Amino acid sequence: MSRLGGLLLALALAACGGGQSNTIQISPGPVRGMLLQNPPQRLATFSAASLLATLVSHIAPPGVPLDLSVAGSEYLLAQGGTPVCDIAVYHIRYATVGGAGESTTASGALMVPSGLDARCRGGRPVVLYAHGTTTARSFNIADLTGQQNAEGLFLAALFASQGYIVVAPNYAGYDTSTLPYHPYLIADQQSKDMIDALTAARSALPAADAPLTTDGGRLFVTGYSQGGYVAMATQRAMEAAGLRVTAAAPMSGPYALAAFVDAVFYGEVDGGAPIVATFLVTAYQKAYANIYPSAADVFEAPYAAGIDALLPSSLSRSDLYAQGKLPQYALFSPTPPGPVFADSVTPPSTLVTLAPVFALGFGANDLVKSSYRSSYLSDAQANPDGAWPASTTGVAAASPGLPLRQALKQNDLRNWTPAAPLLLCGGDADPVVFWLNTQLMQGYWAAHAPAAASISVLDLESAASASDPYATAKKDFGLAKQAIAANAVLHGATDGGAAAVAGAYHATLVAPFCFAAVKSFFDSQ
């Protein structure tokens, strides 16, 4: 026997326990939802007073003074109340899956309240939160010192400091995750990620810094923007699996995904579309492996090379734009993609106020090849969505031919009805995630949900009635818009502040008011 053969035999016998068995023992890998470090790392503790100081120093809408009581952090404090509980913030790491079902890891935040007040100990409700789109590969919602982590501070101030246990995943592909991409808007994966984070967090309770705080059995699911979509997908998945959700409140999410992307390709281009398109198309390629043979089939030459691995990134958004990795606004060429679409790529829209936003989506150095846009539009015309641009079935196209539209149909959420009470919150002038998504979900549920379903919709732009539980939120939201517009005019804006309002609308204006409304909704359950 050769020395190599003898060595291999010796190793095999060693693996078999010295030759006592002919079966090699292989240690199983971590299962989904396994907490990979127990106890988890504690990142910070906050007294109620120190959390209040941190919140006020970190969060305020751009251009709005901190002493404006109806906006940003001070509005949240007014609606959520002064922090009652001390909180401990833990960084959890757990096992989950990627977009193609591959084993991977992810991380997130576990915020645990404690204190002498009865609201801060014993069996407490759990909020499971899904965050919005971020390009930062290093994003960690558990790091409450980060200047860009408004969501983490919102959660700490509104929920954890008021006695809710908070679980908030960073998602696979971020922070310490071993996945080299993020499975963006893939309903099956993102809901599994959320459920796995919840499972891991529950196994870490009671936490060392809050030994008297336990999971009380009530679960609330919410999220904003991308996270609004993820929250809805998670409620759907949990209820389908027989897991109890007490209530849910998706905020400003792209729920009717197939219709939303159709609208974008027809010419109603949302703000920030190049980032979303890159995340979406490359994630679907990694999950389904059929979106394109080559990235150059979809993306223009200046961007195609390396775009599969571009997001999330170690570069800031401004650096991504400055270095020519992505265009800031121009998704499409201003030249129609062929004569057949010359007069039909921008259908009439009731969203007149968003016309300037749509226009920004067309320009030089655009991201998506006209040939691919033409293929998409041809398929959309041959296999139209059932709710946009014309309402027929109310659901995604029955048999789309283009692989991207097939993937969008697979991930569209117009195919279920909630069992637990649900609140949808947003604003109908949103230039980033169109209110169309909420309208189409509302329309679908009006036709398909049982009469007993408890579904509420809060449009912050709508007029308040005398008995409206969200009348204050609507009024104060309007005042915040006026303040941002007035501040822009004061600093030289000649458009009445419209651009400033549009720029702040999705991430800064709507978010705090929806967060406060969601807290009120959860408290009432």
Q: Which residues does each predicted region cover?
A:
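Accessory cap/linker subdomain of secreted extracellular hydrolases
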Residues: 254-415
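Short beta-strand/loop motif that positions the catalytic acidic residue
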Residues: 423-430
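Short, surface-exposed "cap/lid" segments of acyl-processing enzymes
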Residues: 98-107, 111-163
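Alpha/beta-hydrolase active-site loop
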Residues: 184-208
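Catalytic-loop region of hydrolases
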Residues: 20-117
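Short alpha-helix in the alpha/beta-hydrolase fold that links the catalytic acid
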Residues: 420-421, 433-447
